[in-house]
């Protein structure tokens, strides 16, 4: 089994003999480029952090100096329930009759102490 350190030294010596003194120069250039790269991206990361912080605290606004246009649309009925018509006054025994608008179904809102579909049962509670 070969020692890893011996193999690295052999490869280093092989590269050194193949490139001669150029190897030292190219290594220096790589080191300088790495340092420049670290400085550049260090500054960029700081700038990006500032941009992000500003975007999180920025509140956008705009000024509008125009006339509002009239809308000729009918407002849809947004109610779900309405009181029953007078002919259903006696539908709920001890409560108030309500109509589900879209289904035209009746239900009762019982007075305190009563329950059941038509508020006709005395509640035990």
From Swiss-Prot:
Please provide the record's keywords in A-Z order: Disulfide bond, EGF-like domain, Growth factor, Secreted, Signal
* Protein name, per record: Probable growth factor FPV211
Q: Supply one GO BP term.
A: epidermal growth factor receptor signaling pathway
MF annotations from Gene Ontology = epidermal growth factor receptor binding; growth factor activity
Q: What positions does the domain EGF-like occupy?
A: 80-120
Where does it sit, as one GO cellular component term?
extracellular space
The subcellular location is: Secreted
């Amino acid at each position: 089994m070969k020692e890893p350190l011996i193999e690295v030294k052999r490869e280093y010596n092989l590269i050194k003999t193949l490139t001669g003194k150029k190897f030292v120069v190219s290594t220096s250039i790589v080191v300088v480029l790495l340092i420049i790269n670290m400085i550049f991206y260090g500054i960029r990361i700081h700038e990006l952090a500032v941009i992000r912080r500003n975007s999180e605290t920025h509140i956008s606004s705009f000024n509008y100096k125009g006339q509002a246009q009239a809308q000729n649309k009918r407002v849809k009925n947004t109610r779900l329930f309405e009181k029953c018509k007078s002919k259903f006054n006696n539908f709920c025994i001890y409560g108030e009759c309500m109509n589900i608008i879209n289904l035209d179904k009746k239900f009762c809102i019982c007075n305190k102490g009563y329950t059941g579909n038509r508020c006709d049962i005395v509640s035990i509670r």
